């Protein structure tokens, strides 16, 4: 890794209000850059609006932490150090859930990742988008690496995280765009978002991606679903409710962003609203 080049890019981004899109539009930064996987991931996340990192670093995330240090020195990113991975994952979930700002959780290799994974259940079960970045065993087939799962089987952490939500093992640095595309679609899913796990093998973190095209990386745009409700649907619903004495509205987790609409519908129909575990707080108790 050429620290001078990393510092140069970080400075340019900082001078452009930490807006990578602006840097590319004004050609302050070239579209194609030679960067390590670690820096490429930081740039890719920055383009998606991720600037806050909740971290407990270790030998599994040393290279990533070193690049992050440089970007923080120029004010592009902000890192918050924690002492407990479960607490860290919960804090990241709260930031994304309450303030609509997606952060990244960073751990080392082994037990730290498992702890953060346990904490990510809150994000997974409540449909909250958060990035999780864990150090991972090398791609050289050396077997489990230090405190990793002691079993001679390939890609164990990738399998576990894929079961928890969705994940990508960056075995090949050039696959960064594909991993980030999947992460974008998961963390910003308008109906069922969730945590996305990036597994960074120790040996691929410093590997250089030649000519990474920053333009093709996903941006920070929201994913919008087209409205499938027609006037016919509304008329049919109106006819249905006219012939029913009592209406009860059952509200699930997908209603969290539509509390005003749910309230108005409830008032117009004089109908009580039954909440589910994923929609608690959508409406006040009274």
Question: Which positions does each model-derived feature cover?
Answer:
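N-terminal alpha/beta PP-like core and its mobile active-site loop of ThDP/TPP-dependent enzymes
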Residues: 2-286
């Amino acid at each position: 890794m050429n620290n001078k080049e990393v510092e140069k890019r970080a400075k340019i981004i900082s001078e452009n209000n930490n807006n990578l899109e602006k840097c590319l539009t004004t050609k302050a930064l070239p579209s194609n850059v030679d960067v390590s996987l670690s820096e490429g991931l930081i740039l890719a996340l920055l383009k998606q609006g991720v600037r806050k990192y909740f971290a407990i670093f270790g030998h599994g995330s040393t290279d990533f932490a070193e690049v992050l240090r440089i970007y923080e020195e120029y004010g592009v990113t902000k890192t918050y150090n924690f002492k407990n991975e479960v607490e860290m994952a919960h804090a990241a979930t709260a930031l994304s859930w309450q303030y609509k700002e997606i952060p990244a959780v960073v751990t080392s290799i082994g037990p730290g990742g498992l702890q953060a994974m346990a904490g990510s259940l809150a994000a997974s079960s409540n449909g909250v988008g958060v990035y999780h970045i864990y150090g991972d065993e090398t791609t050289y087939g050396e077997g489990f690496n230090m405190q990793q799962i002691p079993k001679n089987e390939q890609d164990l952490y990738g399998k576990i995280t894929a079961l928890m939500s969705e994940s990508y093992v960056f075995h090949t640095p050039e696959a960064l765009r594909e991993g980030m595309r999947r992460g974008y679609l998961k963390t910003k899913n308008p109906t069922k978002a969730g945590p996305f796990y990036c597994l960074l093998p120790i040996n691929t973190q410093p590997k250089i991606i030649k000519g990474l095209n920053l333009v093709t990386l996903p941006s920070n745009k929201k994913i919008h679903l087209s409205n499938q409700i027609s006037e016919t649907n509304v008329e049919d619903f109106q006819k249905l409710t006219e012939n029913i004495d009592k209406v009860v509205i059952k509200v699930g987790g997908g209603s969290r962003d539509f509390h005003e609409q749910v309230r108005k519908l409830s008032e117009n129909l004089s109908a009580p609203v039954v909440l589910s575990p994923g929609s608690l707080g959508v409406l006040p108790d009274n």
